[in-house]
Structures are given as C-alpha cells and as structure tokens.
Amino acid sequence: VDAVVESTGRFADKESASKHIDAGAKWVIISAPAKGPDVTVCMGVNEEMLDPKEHKVISNASCTTNCLAPVAKVLHHEFGIVRGLMTTIHSYTNDQRILDLPHKDLRRARAAAVSMIPTTTGAARAVALVLPELQGRLDGMAIRVPTPNVSVVDLVAELEKETTTEAVNEALKKAAQGTMKGVLQYMDQPLVSIDFNGNDHSSIVDASVTKVLEGRMVKVLAWYDNEMGYSTRLRDLITYISNKAV
C-alpha cells in the first residue's frame, strides 16, 4: 500500500494516523484538519511545501479552508491582508442531528433540516497552516443551513493597499485563468447554490457581488461544492505525492 486516505474521522491526529504507516503504508492523507500532521496542504496554494520523503502524515485541510485559502492568497499577494473575518454558509453535515438530540454543541444538537444553525469553524485560522504569513490575521464562524450540498464563503478583509472592485476581480480572474486554474474559478453569472452541485473547483468566486468600501475593505463571495470540490483536491493530492516521490 502506497497511500492510505484516512476518512473515518477516528484517526485525525499524527499519533493515531501513524498506525497506517506502522502497518506498511508509505503515506497517510487525512481528509480533515488534523492535529500535528507533518504538513497541511491545500492544492493550488501550498503544495510546494510538501516533501514526500519527509512528510508521511499529511492533512488535506477542510473543504472550507480549501475554498478560502486560494482567495486569501490572491488578496494577500496583490493587496496585503491586514485582518479579515469569514463566514461560511455551509450545508448541513453528518456531525449534526436529524432531530433535536444530544450533542456537545447545543446548536448542532438541533434538527439540521429545519433551522439555520450558527456554529464554530477553524477554517479561517487554519489558513495560516498553508499561508503562514496570515497567522493571526483571519478568523470566522459557520452558519449551517438546510441544504444537502454546496456552501459559500463570505470573506470581509481590511487591505494594506487601496484598491477597487474592478481591480480585486481582475486579480482573482487572472489567478483563476493562470496559476490557480482548476482550483479557483471566476464567474459573474447570477447563479444559486444548486448550480454548483458537481463543480470540482475548490473555490468559485462570485464576481458579481465583490465589493470594496473606502478603498481598503473588501468583501468576496466564493462558492464551493463541499463534497465534489474537496474530493477532487484529495485525488489531486494523492497524484501529486506519487508523482513527486518518483
């Protein structure tokens, strides 16, 4: 066995995931944020940090971090991010309850299909694992909503440089058509969440709602199929590891 994809949710730290290495696997890719992995990777953002000879327990981060990180990288590279807050409006997941039932998070304990549910997410802070220069600059929260798939990141950030809506969109479009092609998508059509079902990009910028206030405050909306997009990056990561290890 060359690579094990650890998707059970039970082995989300280096110590427990390393049991796969002990059993003969060369690499373990954890399909979630992980505690103490050798490296956390978002494809299209920081895969150059990955060294298959040194890194054996690898985290593919979360679907939300994979959506936020490409946008944050472009904004920080082009304009500089001073600080930012993110909200992910996220389809419900298996961690929630079908009916009101016990859960350590009293809001996630409520029936998932009938309420909008504010809850926590570490996705914004986790961006610093793939973009260390943003350490301490991003935070956020989640609102779980009664849709089965597709989510959207709403990022509001203060920038170092003055800019315009047009300049922000142009920077994101350039990245989507260039270095981040296949990971970041740029679109300006009046679409809704179901239209992105099956989209395999990590992040789909909704350029029609980009806003800049007083030159240095920017708001960017980015959609993501939190199942298909993430699974595709997981596949890409496995391929990248195997190719780089040759």
Please give the residue ranges for each predicted region.
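N-terminal Rossmann-like NAD(P) cofactor-binding subdomain of oxidoreductases
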Residues: 1-109, 212, 236, 244-245
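Structured loop/turn residues at secondary-structure junctions
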Residues: 8-9, 63, 119, 160, ...
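A generic structural signal for alpha-helix starts
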Residues: 11, 66, 163, 228-229
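Asparagine-centered polar/low-complexity signal
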Residues: 46-47, 60, 66, 115, ...
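Catalytic-loop motifs flanking and including active-site residues across diverse enzymes
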Residues: 63-68, 123, 151, 230
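C-terminal substrate-binding/catalytic lobe of Rossmann-fold NAD(P)-dependent oxidoreductases
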Residues: 80-83, 88-218
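NAD(P)-dependent Rossmann-like dehydrogenase/reductase catalytic/cofactor-binding core
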Residues: 197-246
